[in-house]
Amino acid sequence: MSNVEQPFMQGIDDGWNLKNYLNIQSTSLCLDKLCNIYTQGQDENEDAKELQAIKIKIEWCKDTSVLLSSICVMLLDSIHDFLVQQGKITKESISKRDYSHEITIFNFKYAQQEMQNEKLYHFAKLLEPALESLKVTNNHITHATIVGQVSGSEHNLSTAIEQVDVIVNYFYDSSEKFLELGNKVQTLGKAKNKKHWLGVYQSFGKASVDQIQKQLECYNVRMMELNKTDENNESAICESQASSKEDERSDKTTSSSKKKSFTKLISNSRLNLWNKQ
Protein backbone atom coordinates (compact mmCIF):
# COMPACT_ATOMS: atom_id res chain seq x y z
CA MET A 1 0.00 0.00 0.00
CA SER A 2 1.33 3.45 -0.90
CA ASN A 3 2.14 6.17 1.63
CA VAL A 4 -0.82 8.16 0.33
CA GLU A 5 -3.29 5.28 0.78
CA GLN A 6 -2.16 4.42 4.32
CA PRO A 7 -3.68 7.52 6.01
CA PHE A 8 -6.97 6.80 4.24
CA MET A 9 -7.09 3.24 5.57
CA GLN A 10 -5.99 4.38 9.01
CA GLY A 11 -8.80 6.95 8.99
CA ILE A 12 -11.35 4.19 8.51
CA ASP A 13 -9.74 2.00 11.19
CA ASP A 14 -9.80 4.89 13.67
CA GLY A 15 -13.48 5.54 13.06
CA TRP A 16 -12.54 8.64 11.03
CA ASN A 17 -12.56 10.87 14.08
CA LEU A 18 -12.59 14.65 14.30
CA LYS A 19 -8.85 15.20 14.11
CA ASN A 20 -8.78 13.24 10.82
CA TYR A 21 -11.74 14.77 9.02
CA LEU A 22 -10.52 18.34 9.50
CA ASN A 23 -7.48 17.61 7.33
CA ILE A 24 -8.35 19.87 4.38
CA GLN A 25 -5.47 18.65 2.23
CA SER A 26 -6.46 15.00 2.62
CA THR A 27 -10.09 15.67 1.64
CA SER A 28 -9.01 17.68 -1.39
CA LEU A 29 -6.69 14.85 -2.45
CA CYS A 30 -9.54 12.34 -2.11
CA LEU A 31 -11.81 14.46 -4.30
CA ASP A 32 -9.13 14.76 -6.98
CA LYS A 33 -8.70 10.98 -6.95
CA LEU A 34 -12.46 10.47 -7.22
CA CYS A 35 -12.63 12.84 -10.18
CA ASN A 36 -10.02 10.73 -11.97
CA ILE A 37 -11.77 7.49 -11.02
CA TYR A 38 -15.16 8.67 -12.26
CA THR A 39 -13.93 10.17 -15.54
CA GLN A 40 -11.38 7.58 -16.65
CA GLY A 41 -12.36 5.38 -19.57
CA GLN A 42 -15.24 7.63 -20.64
CA ASP A 43 -15.74 8.86 -24.21
CA GLU A 44 -14.53 12.46 -24.12
CA ASN A 45 -16.31 13.30 -27.38
CA GLU A 46 -19.74 11.77 -26.84
CA ASP A 47 -19.87 12.40 -23.08
CA ALA A 48 -18.13 15.79 -23.00
CA LYS A 49 -21.01 17.61 -21.29
CA GLU A 50 -21.47 14.93 -18.63
CA LEU A 51 -17.74 14.76 -17.89
CA GLN A 52 -17.61 18.53 -17.61
CA ALA A 53 -20.51 18.37 -15.14
CA ILE A 54 -18.61 15.85 -13.00
CA LYS A 55 -15.52 18.06 -12.94
CA ILE A 56 -17.55 21.17 -12.08
CA LYS A 57 -19.33 19.37 -9.24
CA ILE A 58 -16.10 17.96 -7.80
CA GLU A 59 -14.47 21.39 -7.96
CA TRP A 60 -17.45 22.90 -6.16
CA CYS A 61 -17.16 20.21 -3.48
CA LYS A 62 -13.47 21.02 -3.00
CA ASP A 63 -14.22 24.73 -2.57
CA THR A 64 -17.04 23.95 -0.15
CA SER A 65 -14.84 21.57 1.82
CA VAL A 66 -12.19 24.24 2.34
CA LEU A 67 -14.80 26.80 3.37
CA LEU A 68 -16.66 24.61 5.87
CA SER A 69 -13.53 23.02 7.33
CA SER A 70 -11.91 26.42 7.80
CA ILE A 71 -14.97 27.82 9.54
CA CYS A 72 -15.18 24.66 11.63
CA VAL A 73 -11.57 24.87 12.81
CA MET A 74 -11.76 28.58 13.63
CA LEU A 75 -15.07 28.09 15.42
CA LEU A 76 -13.78 25.21 17.55
CA ASP A 77 -10.59 27.13 18.30
CA SER A 78 -12.67 30.01 19.63
CA ILE A 79 -14.73 27.60 21.75
CA HIS A 80 -11.49 26.21 23.18
CA ASP A 81 -10.34 29.75 24.05
CA PHE A 82 -13.73 30.39 25.64
CA LEU A 83 -13.33 27.27 27.80
CA VAL A 84 -9.84 28.38 28.84
CA GLN A 85 -11.24 31.78 29.89
CA GLN A 86 -13.95 30.03 31.89
CA GLY A 87 -11.36 27.81 33.59
CA LYS A 88 -12.88 24.61 32.18
CA ILE A 89 -9.62 23.49 30.55
CA THR A 90 -6.00 24.56 30.93
CA LYS A 91 -3.81 26.16 28.29
CA GLU A 92 -1.32 23.34 28.76
CA SER A 93 -3.84 20.76 27.55
CA ILE A 94 -3.38 21.94 23.98
CA SER A 95 0.14 20.51 23.88
CA LYS A 96 -0.96 17.00 24.81
CA ARG A 97 -0.96 14.42 22.02
CA ASP A 98 -4.42 13.15 22.93
CA TYR A 99 -5.99 16.58 22.49
CA SER A 100 -8.76 16.64 19.90
CA HIS A 101 -11.95 18.46 19.05
CA GLU A 102 -13.96 15.76 20.79
CA ILE A 103 -12.48 16.95 24.09
CA THR A 104 -13.36 20.55 23.27
CA ILE A 105 -16.98 19.66 22.47
CA PHE A 106 -17.25 17.38 25.50
CA ASN A 107 -16.11 20.18 27.83
CA PHE A 108 -18.24 22.76 26.06
CA LYS A 109 -21.40 20.70 26.60
CA TYR A 110 -20.77 20.51 30.33
CA ALA A 111 -19.76 24.17 30.53
CA GLN A 112 -22.96 25.44 28.95
CA GLN A 113 -25.02 23.14 31.18
CA GLU A 114 -23.33 24.54 34.29
CA MET A 115 -23.81 28.12 33.09
CA GLN A 116 -27.50 27.44 32.35
CA ASN A 117 -27.30 29.89 29.47
CA GLU A 118 -30.21 29.43 27.07
CA LYS A 119 -28.41 30.97 24.09
CA LEU A 120 -25.35 28.77 24.54
CA TYR A 121 -27.62 25.76 24.96
CA HIS A 122 -29.30 26.35 21.59
CA PHE A 123 -25.93 27.08 20.01
CA ALA A 124 -24.48 23.79 21.29
CA LYS A 125 -27.59 21.98 20.09
CA LEU A 126 -27.02 23.21 16.52
CA LEU A 127 -23.25 22.80 16.68
CA GLU A 128 -23.37 19.02 17.09
CA PRO A 129 -25.33 18.19 13.88
CA ALA A 130 -23.22 20.66 11.89
CA LEU A 131 -20.00 18.95 12.96
CA GLU A 132 -21.53 15.52 12.46
CA SER A 133 -22.62 16.42 8.92
CA LEU A 134 -19.06 17.40 7.99
CA LYS A 135 -17.75 14.24 9.62
CA VAL A 136 -20.19 12.03 7.67
CA THR A 137 -19.43 13.87 4.42
CA ASN A 138 -15.68 13.39 4.63
CA ASN A 139 -16.11 9.83 5.88
CA HIS A 140 -18.12 9.06 2.74
CA ILE A 141 -15.51 10.70 0.49
CA THR A 142 -12.67 8.75 2.09
CA HIS A 143 -14.53 5.44 1.88
CA ALA A 144 -15.48 6.06 -1.76
CA THR A 145 -11.84 6.83 -2.58
CA ILE A 146 -10.60 3.63 -0.93
CA VAL A 147 -13.23 1.51 -2.70
CA GLY A 148 -12.44 3.15 -6.04
CA GLN A 149 -8.69 2.59 -5.67
CA VAL A 150 -9.00 -0.99 -4.44
CA SER A 151 -11.49 -2.08 -7.11
CA GLY A 152 -9.55 -0.41 -9.90
CA SER A 153 -12.58 -0.80 -12.17
CA GLU A 154 -13.96 1.86 -14.44
CA HIS A 155 -17.38 3.28 -13.62
CA ASN A 156 -20.06 3.58 -16.25
CA LEU A 157 -21.12 7.17 -16.78
CA SER A 158 -24.52 6.96 -15.11
CA THR A 159 -23.00 5.40 -11.98
CA ALA A 160 -20.25 8.02 -11.88
CA ILE A 161 -22.77 10.87 -12.13
CA GLU A 162 -24.89 9.27 -9.41
CA GLN A 163 -21.90 8.92 -7.07
CA VAL A 164 -20.84 12.53 -7.59
CA ASP A 165 -24.39 13.75 -6.95
CA VAL A 166 -24.37 11.88 -3.64
CA ILE A 167 -21.23 13.78 -2.58
CA VAL A 168 -22.73 17.09 -3.71
CA ASN A 169 -25.84 16.40 -1.64
CA TYR A 170 -23.69 15.66 1.41
CA PHE A 171 -21.90 18.99 1.09
CA TYR A 172 -25.14 20.84 0.36
CA ASP A 173 -26.76 19.41 3.49
CA SER A 174 -23.68 20.21 5.57
CA SER A 175 -23.63 23.79 4.25
CA GLU A 176 -27.27 24.29 5.24
CA LYS A 177 -26.55 23.02 8.76
CA PHE A 178 -23.62 25.42 9.11
CA LEU A 179 -25.86 28.24 7.84
CA GLU A 180 -28.37 27.44 10.56
CA LEU A 181 -25.56 27.41 13.11
CA GLY A 182 -24.18 30.70 11.79
CA ASN A 183 -27.56 32.39 12.16
CA LYS A 184 -27.68 31.23 15.78
CA VAL A 185 -24.19 32.62 16.35
CA GLN A 186 -25.51 36.02 15.24
CA THR A 187 -28.02 35.96 18.11
CA LEU A 188 -25.17 35.24 20.53
CA GLY A 189 -23.45 38.41 19.43
CA LYS A 190 -26.56 40.46 20.15
CA ALA A 191 -26.75 39.39 23.79
CA LYS A 192 -26.32 42.09 26.44
CA ASN A 193 -23.53 40.26 28.29
CA LYS A 194 -21.76 38.89 25.24
CA LYS A 195 -18.22 39.32 26.56
CA HIS A 196 -17.80 35.66 27.54
CA TRP A 197 -18.66 34.33 24.08
CA LEU A 198 -17.53 37.25 21.92
CA GLY A 199 -14.76 35.09 20.45
CA VAL A 200 -17.29 32.51 19.26
CA TYR A 201 -19.31 35.23 17.59
CA GLN A 202 -16.31 36.81 15.87
CA SER A 203 -15.06 33.47 14.53
CA PHE A 204 -18.34 32.81 12.73
CA GLY A 205 -19.56 36.25 11.81
CA LYS A 206 -21.94 37.47 9.14
CA ALA A 207 -19.19 37.41 6.49
CA SER A 208 -18.76 33.65 6.94
CA VAL A 209 -22.51 33.08 6.79
CA ASP A 210 -22.66 35.11 3.57
CA GLN A 211 -19.79 33.06 2.13
CA ILE A 212 -21.67 29.81 2.70
CA GLN A 213 -24.83 31.24 1.17
CA LYS A 214 -22.85 32.47 -1.82
CA GLN A 215 -21.23 29.04 -2.20
CA LEU A 216 -24.64 27.35 -2.33
CA GLU A 217 -25.83 29.85 -4.94
CA CYS A 218 -22.60 29.35 -6.88
CA TYR A 219 -23.42 25.67 -7.42
CA ASN A 220 -26.80 26.48 -8.93
CA VAL A 221 -25.28 29.14 -11.18
CA ARG A 222 -22.56 26.78 -12.45
CA MET A 223 -25.05 24.06 -13.29
CA MET A 224 -27.42 26.49 -14.99
CA GLU A 225 -24.59 27.80 -17.15
CA LEU A 226 -23.59 24.27 -18.08
CA ASN A 227 -27.12 23.50 -19.28
CA LYS A 228 -27.39 26.57 -21.50
CA THR A 229 -27.02 26.37 -25.26
CA ASP A 230 -23.76 27.42 -26.89
CA GLU A 231 -25.33 30.72 -27.88
CA ASN A 232 -26.52 31.45 -24.37
CA ASN A 233 -23.14 30.40 -22.99
CA GLU A 234 -21.41 32.96 -25.18
CA SER A 235 -23.83 35.63 -23.99
CA ALA A 236 -23.28 34.65 -20.35
CA ILE A 237 -19.51 34.84 -20.81
CA CYS A 238 -19.79 38.35 -22.23
CA GLU A 239 -21.99 39.45 -19.34
CA SER A 240 -19.63 37.80 -16.87
CA GLN A 241 -16.64 39.60 -18.35
CA ALA A 242 -18.45 42.93 -18.16
CA SER A 243 -19.49 42.42 -14.55
CA SER A 244 -16.06 41.10 -13.58
CA LYS A 245 -14.49 44.43 -14.51
CA GLU A 246 -17.02 46.18 -12.34
CA ASP A 247 -16.37 43.82 -9.40
CA GLU A 248 -12.62 43.49 -9.89
CA ARG A 249 -11.69 45.68 -6.97
CA SER A 250 -14.17 43.92 -4.68
CA ASP A 251 -12.96 40.47 -5.78
CA LYS A 252 -9.33 41.40 -5.11
CA THR A 253 -10.25 42.55 -1.62
CA THR A 254 -12.22 39.36 -0.94
CA SER A 255 -9.45 37.18 -2.36
CA SER A 256 -6.85 38.95 -0.26
CA SER A 257 -9.01 38.55 2.84
CA LYS A 258 -9.54 34.83 2.20
CA LYS A 259 -5.85 34.29 1.57
CA LYS A 260 -4.93 35.96 4.85
CA SER A 261 -7.57 33.98 6.75
CA PHE A 262 -6.53 30.62 5.30
CA THR A 263 -2.82 31.42 5.74
CA LYS A 264 -3.48 32.17 9.39
CA LEU A 265 -5.60 29.03 9.68
CA ILE A 266 -3.08 26.65 8.12
CA SER A 267 -0.24 28.07 10.22
CA ASN A 268 -2.28 27.61 13.41
CA SER A 269 -0.36 25.32 15.76
CA ARG A 270 -3.44 23.39 16.80
CA LEU A 271 -4.45 22.65 13.22
CA ASN A 272 -0.93 21.48 12.41
CA LEU A 273 -1.03 19.22 15.47
CA TRP A 274 -4.32 17.61 14.40
CA ASN A 275 -3.15 17.06 10.82
CA LYS A 276 0.05 15.35 11.98
CA GLN A 277 -1.73 12.94 14.30
Swiss-Prot record:
Signal peptide: none annotated. Keywords: Cytoplasm, Nucleus. Residues 232-262 are annotated as: Disordered. It is found in: Cytoplasm; Nucleus. Residues 234-243 have a biased composition (Polar residues). It comes from the Eukaryota. GO terms for cellular component: cytoplasm; cytosol; nucleus. This is Uncharacterized protein C21D10.08c. Its main location: cytoplasm.
